[in-house]
């Protein structure tokens, strides 16, 4: 079909709203007349008569459609190349967009990891600072201890060294005085018991040991100042312990002496109350000699002459009155009271050394 047949009339007929052409209607009427067929004018027009073409709206120039463009045309090669390049660029753009999205996701994950690591770094840095400050504070304010001093090592001896030496010398002198007192009391006891004024071996050893302790040399050049102060502190502690021990020993000894005296007095009182017919010997002690028959008879004769009650003359005056009696070797008998009795302590000399400790 030619392009002229596909005009506005064809479109009107296709829409079933246009009327057939007048020429065709005339031809059909002729055919109907020849064939003796009644015409059907309503099929072609509503009014039943022919109207001019100029009045037909279908043929109006404003109602005509433009001629249809053929569907297939030969395009230039540049169009095809351009379309291919555009398609390639679009695909490449999509790939780059996807790759960029993946990289952005990876960057987000790395940012989260960096944030967590930064927080941990800040936390551990603060903890490290706190620990360093605590360590510095502990080093600066260390607790006072006898064996711990500041780590100052001056080349010249400190000014407080003389005061420390004075204190040491005072402690050593007090220790020597106390040692001599203890040794003198022990020597007096042994001398009164044995009637021999010979210093014992312990008495000779104790001052030497005290002197060795008191005059033990310190070697400041061989060790550091901390070691020297530590050694001196240990020595002072040992001396204080020795002094406390000697004090306790002296106190126990004095208590024992007082107890012995009270027991001896109580025993003498009991013997006086018994008023036994047989005369009892004197109470044995460290300062009285053993029993003697002759001396005992003489003492009782003197007591009878003076009007006594059978008690020896030396028994009433204390345990030290029997020191002038002669001492026989073997006593004839020994009572149970004499067996259980402890020796009486010796009399101390009136010249007592000055005790500076108490």
From Swiss-Prot:
GO terms for cellular component: cytoplasm; nucleus; spindle pole body. Residues 203-212 have a biased composition (Polar residues). Keywords: Coiled coil, Cytoplasm, Cytoskeleton, Nucleus. Its main location: nucleus. It is found in: Nucleus; Cytoplasm, Cytoskeleton, Microtubule organizing center, Spindle pole body. InterPro entries: Spc42. The keyword tRNA-binding does not apply. Belongs to the SPC42 family. Residues 82-140, 226-275 form a coiled coil. Residues 16-33 have a biased composition (Basic residues). Residues 1-43, 135-166, 189-226, 310-358 are annotated as: Disordered. Forms a polymeric layer at the periphery of the spindle pole body (SPB) central plaque which has an essential function during SPB duplication and may facilitate attachment of the SPB to the nuclear membrane. The keyword Coiled coil applies. It comes from Lachancea thermotolerans (strain ATCC 56472 / CBS 6340 / NRRL Y-8284). This is Spindle pole body component SPC42. Residues 310-321 have a biased composition (Gly residues).
């Amino acid at each position: 079909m030619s392009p002229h047949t596909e005009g506005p009339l064809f479109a009107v007929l296709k829409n079933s709203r246009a009327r057939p052409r007048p020429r065709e209607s005339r031809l059909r009427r002729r055919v109907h007349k020849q064939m003796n067929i009644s015409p059907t004018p309503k099929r072609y027009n509503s009014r039943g008569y022919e109207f001019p073409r100029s009045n037909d709206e279908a043929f109006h120039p404003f109602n005509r459609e433009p001629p249809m463009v053929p569907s297939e045309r030969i395009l230039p090669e540049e169009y095809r190349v351009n379309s291919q390049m555009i398609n390639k660029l679009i695909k490449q753009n999509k790939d780059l967009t996807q790759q960029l999205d993946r990289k952005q996701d990876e960057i987000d994950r790395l940012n989260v990891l960096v944030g967590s690591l930064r927080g941990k770094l800040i936390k551990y840095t603060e903890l490290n600072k706190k620990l360093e400050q605590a360590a510095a504070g502990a080093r600066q304010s260390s607790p006072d201890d006898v064996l711990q001093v500041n780590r100052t090592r001056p080349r010249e001896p400190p000014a407080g060294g003389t005061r420390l030496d004075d204190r040491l010398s005072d402690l050593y002198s007090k220790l020597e005085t106390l040692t001599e007192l203890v040794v003198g009391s022990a020597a007096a006891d042994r001398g009164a018991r044995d009637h021999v004024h010979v210093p014992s071996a312990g008495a000779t050893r104790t001052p030497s040991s005290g002197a060795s302790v008191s005059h033990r040399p310190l070697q400041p050049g061989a060790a550091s100042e901390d070691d020297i102060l530590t050694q001196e502190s240990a020595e002072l502690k040992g001396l204080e312990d020795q002094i406390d021990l000697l004090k306790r020993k002296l106190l126990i000894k004095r208590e024992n002496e007082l107890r012995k005296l009270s027991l001896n007095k109580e025993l003498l009182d009991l013997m006086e109350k018994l008023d036994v017919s047989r005369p009892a010997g004197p109470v044995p002690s460290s300062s009285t000699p053993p029993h003697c028959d002759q001396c005992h008879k003489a003492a009782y004769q003197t007591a009878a002459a003076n009007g006594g009650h059978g008690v020896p003359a030396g028994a009433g005056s204390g345990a030290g009155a029997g020191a002038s009696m002669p001492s026989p070797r073997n006593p004839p008998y020994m009572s149970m009271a004499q067996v259980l009795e402890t020796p009486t302590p010796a009399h101390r000399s009136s010249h007592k050394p000055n005790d500076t400790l108490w």
